Amino acid sequence: MPAQDNDNNTSAFVNEFLAGWDDDDPFRSPSPETAGTNKTNNKKRKEPDTLGIDKEIDVTKKARVPRVKLDDARLLSDKGIPKLRKTASKLKLKGKGHEFSDAARLLSFYQEWLDDLFPKATFVDALAMCEKAGHKTTLRNARLKWIAEGKPRSTTAEEEEDRDREGQPSASAEPTRMAPIFEKATGAKSKTPTLDNNLFGDDDIYNATPRRNQPTAAPGDIPDDDELDALMAEAESGAAPGASKATNNGAASDSIFGGGAINRRPRPSEVPDDDDLDALMAEAESYRPSTTNHGSIFGNGSASGGGKDKPAMAAPPQEDDDDLDALMAEAEMHASLATKTTGKESTSRERTSEQDGGKDAQNYDEDDLDAWMAEAEAYTKTTSIQVAQPKDTDDDWEAEAAMAEMHGF
């Protein structure tokens, strides 16, 4: 019995050991179990296949990943320009003498920022995209806002902006500060204007009443016809004590229109021109010789003298208005003729003096001028003596009044 048990164990071991060798043998005959399984598999494969046409097909689109762009929204994000503004303080530039290293440091700073913001593009392409996006309205407004934040401003303006943002009503504005000197000036009371000459008078102290502008005559203005007639009459009737000396020297002492001397333009040959000769002749006719002292045809020249003459001058007999007008007309006609003749002769003498060299021109003109002035004085003297006639005392009072009016001019 024990021998049979050993044979059974040995055969079982051999069968188990050689069980796997038949699978690898291509020439072995198939076992009945494996043949049945192969038949079932072949039947399944031979079933007609319709390629899924009869079945419903569900078409599902895959969701696309959003494409990242470097636009204005990305530049305004936290990784964009706000981050660049925060980290700008870390950039240190050395300045003069280190331009190349500073430029390299600046470019590397921007490159690191763009690599973090938009890593898909190169540095040059990212800069071009930033420039293109910078022309949009949103970035323009943001840039203006950043510039305004960098400007200095007062604390009151900042407080008002904070209140507006929070929606609180703004308190009353603080009064503007002012220097003490201006505070004193504004706090002082206004004084009433006063007049220097008339403090308590009835004049308008505030100058509110409109007044008529009074024309002021310039010193060189020409008097009107009435004043000229009055001055000519007084000049013809009066005599100057130093007229003869002035005429001998070739120049008049005083003008009938004032105390100013005539401005003459000097010439190389010291020969007076036509205008100077005319002026000298007109002044010469207004004077009489110093040997005879006659008073004014209107009296002694004082309104309150009562008809009494000065002791130094004897009052000549007065004449009426018609004789005075005739005398004035005749004197003016003679003066105009003398002036024209003198002008012609002076111009002819100037031409001859220029041709001869101007040696004796000055002496020649002075002698001729003295002759004309002497003739004019003699004519004035004889005319005044011939027309002089006695007159009543009532006419003297009228003459004195006329003389006072002339002094008023």
Swiss-Prot record:
Residues 20-51, 150-367, 388-409 are annotated as: Disordered. GO terms for molecular function: DNA binding. It comes from the Eukaryota. Pfam families: Swi3 (PF07962). Its main location: nucleus. It is found in: Nucleus. Residues 230-246, 400-409 have a biased composition (Low complexity). GO terms for biological process: DNA repair; DNA replication checkpoint signaling; meiotic cell cycle; replication fork arrest; replication fork processing. Keywords: Cell cycle, DNA damage, DNA repair, DNA replication inhibitor, Meiosis, Nucleus. Residues 342-359 have a biased composition (Basic and acidic residues). One of its GO terms (cellular component) is replication fork protection complex. Disulfide bonds: none annotated. Residues 31-40, 288-301 have a biased composition (Polar residues). Belongs to the CSM3 family. Forms a fork protection complex (FPC) with tof-1 and which is required for chromosome segregation during meiosis and DNA damage repair. FPC coordinates leading and lagging strand synthesis and moves with the replication fork. FPC stabilizes replication forks in a configuration that is recognized by replication checkpoint sensors. Component of the fork protection complex (FPC) consisting of tof-1 and csm-3. This is Chromosome segregation in meiosis protein 3. The lineage of its organism: Eukaryota, Fungi, Dikarya, Ascomycota, Pezizomycotina. The gene is csm-3.
